[in-house]
Amino acid sequence: MGARLKTGLWVRAVLRRISSDGTSAMVLKKGDEDAGAVLIVLTDRSGGTGVLREDGSGWTRVDASDAASVDAYLERQKQYDPDLWIVELEMRDVSQPIERTLGSRRLDLDEEA
């Protein structure tokens, strides 16, 4: 696995960037400052919800489309990984892609090409 930005630094940068676009963003659970995994909870005003998890080079949407399944997923992940970060973004529409805006913590993406 290649070099990555420290999680705390990456989360703060994403919060600043997302907030500057008018999207509400907050940390629901602070994990390990250096190497914690990150889950992104997506919500919108119409009640839509979703979860993004990091994969090797970006983000994957988790199969959790209602509040109860999102909460259950988050609880399982917190038990499995105490270093986990959980960030919530309130968007206009959770079905719209935000994965590219989030980017990746990896510093070596060009090496795979």
Specify the residue positions occupied by each region the protein language model found.
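Polybasic/polar functional segments that serve as interface/processing modules
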Residues: 1-113
